């Protein structure tokens, strides 16, 4: 390549004309049409023509000549129709040299300007040809369609980033957020980015919008969405992450209305035992509307007949129907301090299926004959018709337990049944339950519930007994069902005496995992030879499944097969795991929100253990575990009770900073 040769190279996606000043060791020193002198490797050159300039004419003259050449070539480029050229040659499917392409395009004698114009045109429009130095290969129609779609997508992406970042800046700079009806796509991109980060399908484009707009990448998207009114300041983000919906599909609501209409018609009671004469009661929380279990007791010989009655949801909810499918997809009701998401539509769970006082209801009744020591002498499980006489809260039941003979008898039997379980190796964790409640005004209350109060203890033990007897009944009758089993703890810290708070809290780390399986193994944690769950069919799908297996033994419906039960175990594993996360994290969030108002206050804490840079401590008043820096200077040991000061709290970022008071 001789000095004076006109060449072209690519700079910022544009062709630039230049003249060679020197060519040495595969490096080319050039003067450009923009009056810049630079050096490139010869492989950087896009085109070299056969026209040469006289370098002796001087720099200014050379630049003017280069600019004139560039103008000529641009005009020639504008005459080229790349699509038309492609339509002529694409069926040949072979490489075509530059000279031949230029002749096809312009006809007649071809100059360096013609060749350059073609190179420029094909460089700018990559849709129809791929090129390699001085030859070109036409893309197939399928390739053209694919490249065109990709180009349109990239253009849309660039527009979204540009428009999105401009709009985000406008929102953040304004006192009142602009209307966002036409910006739903941007909102969804930022929403997905904040919820899922790198797992978001919009991660790359969202990152560009955030960067170009100057938005804080960590909390900026959240603050923006709050300002727009898309989210509240206390938005439950896990509901979005897990795709949990409050509302029921219209088809489910229509199906539930049909069930209500059918439920108000006279119902045949063939095969059901009439137990409406029993003095039956429910004991639940103050705000409960979905009553799914009731208790009765009557003297029998030297002992008692204890009845645990479960609403017969399966009598109405057909297996595989729309209501059942929705309940299956939800897996369980979800209870949080500020929200409740039911498994079944409220018009069913809180009315037709609910064991409401004074209303006849179909039920599955577990009738256990107990001696005075609470040993089960005999039992039967029957489909029944029941009528609740009293609906008590835990609070009211506690007040009446020493005055009402029935409650007193149930309480005494519950205590004795628990003692039987404890002697069989049951592990009774005694930990306070923290009740967090957020009212409609956003006011937070945090209280401790004594799970060992008479009313809670008797309900708990009655339900454990019912679940145990149902497990034995299904096992002994050869009906497959989903059992819950648990091996003994890897290490036992708590003996029969109950243990300290430290021992109870630490014991949880050594518990064996609960296993769902069709094999009726022992549940060591409860001290029982078999166990399942039956008593909450309004709130837990597994309990509804158990109920159907019982009904199968009664001839009321076709039970699930073993294959179907295994599928249910597998299908419910994911929703049950995220429901646990939802409930635990939301409760922790509201406890931290409560503590945000107590910064500077002192709280009692218990040391759990010492780690490298911190102590792990428990705040007994809230039953949450957190860290305490080692730089306090004190030498603390597990079980030490200390006083800590709340330094900083941020519920949104899940941070709680303490110092030794």
What are these regions (language model features)?
Residues 132-147, 239-240:
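Accessory beta->alpha helical hairpin/"wing" motif in late/C-terminal subdomains of nucleic-acid enzymes
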Residues 53-56:
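N-terminal membrane-targeting/anchoring modules of bacterial envelope and secretion proteins
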Residues 123-135, 231:
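A short, conserved structural fragment
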Residues 58-61, 66, 133-135:
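Negatively charged, Asp/Glu-rich surface segments that serve as flexible interaction/assembly modules
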Residues 121-125, 164, 170-171:
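Mixed-charge (acidic/basic) macromolecular-recognition segments
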Residues 144-168:
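Short, amphipathic alpha-helical interaction segments positioned at domain boundaries
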Residues 2-6, 10-16, 23-26, 35-46, ...:
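Electropositive polyanion-binding surfaces
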Residues 173-272, 277:
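Low-complexity, highly charged intrinsically disordered N-terminal segments
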């Amino acid at each position: 390549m001789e000095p004076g040769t006109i060449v072209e190279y690519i700079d910022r996606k544009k062709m630039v004309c230049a003249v060679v000043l020197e060519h040495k060791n595969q490096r080319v020193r050039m003067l450009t049409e923009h009056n810049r002198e630079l050096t490139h490797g010869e492989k950087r050159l896009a085109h070299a023509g056969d026209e040469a300039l006289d370098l002796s004419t001087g720099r200014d003259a050379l630049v003017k000549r280069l600019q004139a050449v560039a103008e000529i070539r641009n005009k020639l480029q504008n005459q080229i129709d790349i699509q038309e050229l492609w339509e002529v040659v694409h069926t040949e499917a072979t490489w075509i040299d530059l000279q031949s392409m230029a002749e096809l395009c312009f006809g007649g004698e071809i100059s360096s300007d013609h060749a350059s114009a073609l190179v420029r045109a094909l460089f700018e429009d990559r849709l129809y040809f791929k090129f390699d130095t001085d030859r070109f290969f036409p893309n197939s129609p399928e390739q053209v369609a694919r490249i065109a779609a990709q180009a349109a997508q990239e253009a849309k992406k660039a527009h979204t980033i540009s428009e999105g970042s401009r709009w985000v800046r406008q929102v953040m700079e304004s006192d009142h957020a602009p209307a966002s009806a036409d910006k739903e796509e941007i909102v969804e991109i930022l929403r997905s980015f904040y919820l899922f980060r790198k797992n978001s399908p919009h991660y790359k484009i969202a990152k560009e919008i955030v960067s170009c707009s100057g938005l804080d990448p960590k909390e900026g998207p959240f603050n923006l969405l709050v300002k727009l009114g898309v989210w509240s300041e206390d938005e439950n983000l896990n509901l979005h992450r897990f795709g949990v919906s409050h509302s029921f599909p219209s088809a489910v609501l229509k199906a539930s209305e049909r069930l209500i209409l059918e439920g108000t018609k006279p119902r045949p009671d063939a095969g059901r035992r009439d137990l409406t004469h029993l003095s039956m009661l429910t004991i639940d929380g103050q705000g409960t509307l979905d009553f799914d279990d009731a208790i009765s007791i009557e003297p029998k010989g030297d002992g008692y007949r204890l009845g645990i009655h479960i609403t017969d949801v399966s009598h109405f909810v057909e297996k595989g129907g729309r209501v059942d499918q929705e309940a299956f997809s939800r897996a369980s009701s979800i209870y949080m301090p500020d929200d409740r998401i039911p498994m079944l539509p409220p018009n069913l769970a809180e009315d037709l299926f609910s064991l409401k006082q004074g209303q006849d209801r179909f039920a599955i009744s577990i009738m256990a004959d107990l001696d005075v020591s609470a040993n089960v002498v005999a039992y039967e499980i029957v489909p029944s018709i029941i009528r609740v006489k009293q609906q008590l809260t835990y609070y009211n039941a506690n007040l009446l337990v020493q005055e009402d003979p029935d409650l007193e008898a149930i309480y005494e039997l519950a205590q004795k049944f628990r003692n039987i379980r404890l002697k069989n190796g049951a592990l009774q964790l005694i930990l306070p339950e923290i009740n967090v409640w957020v009212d409609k005004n956003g006011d937070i209350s945090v209280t401790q519930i004594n799970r060992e109060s008479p009313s809670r203890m008797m309900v708990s033990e009655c339900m454990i007994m019912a679940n145990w007897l149902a497990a034995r009944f299904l096992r002994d009758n050869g009906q497959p069902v989903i059992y819950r089993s648990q091996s003994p703890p890897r290490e036992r810290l708590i003996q029969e005496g109950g243990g300290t708070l430290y021992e109870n809290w630490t014991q949880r780390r050594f518990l064996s995992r609960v296993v769902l399986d069709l094999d009726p193994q022992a549940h060591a944690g409860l001290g029982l030879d078999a166990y399942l769950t039956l008593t909450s069919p309004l709130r837990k799908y597994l309990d509804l499944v158990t109920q159907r297996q019982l009904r199968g033994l009664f001839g009321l419906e076709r039970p699930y097969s073993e294959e179907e039960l295994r599928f249910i175990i597998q299908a419910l594993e994911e929703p049950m795991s995220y429901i646990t996360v939802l409930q635990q994290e939301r409760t922790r969030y509201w406890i931290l929100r409560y503590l945000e108002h107590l910064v500077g206050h002192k709280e009692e804490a218990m040391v759990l253990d010492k780690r490298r840079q911190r102590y792990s401590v428990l705040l007994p008043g809230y039953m949450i575990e957190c860290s305490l820096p080692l730089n306090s200077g004190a030498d603390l040991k597990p079980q030490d009770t200390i006083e800590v000061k709340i330094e900083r709290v941020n519920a949104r970022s899940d941070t709680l900073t303490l110092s030794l008071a």
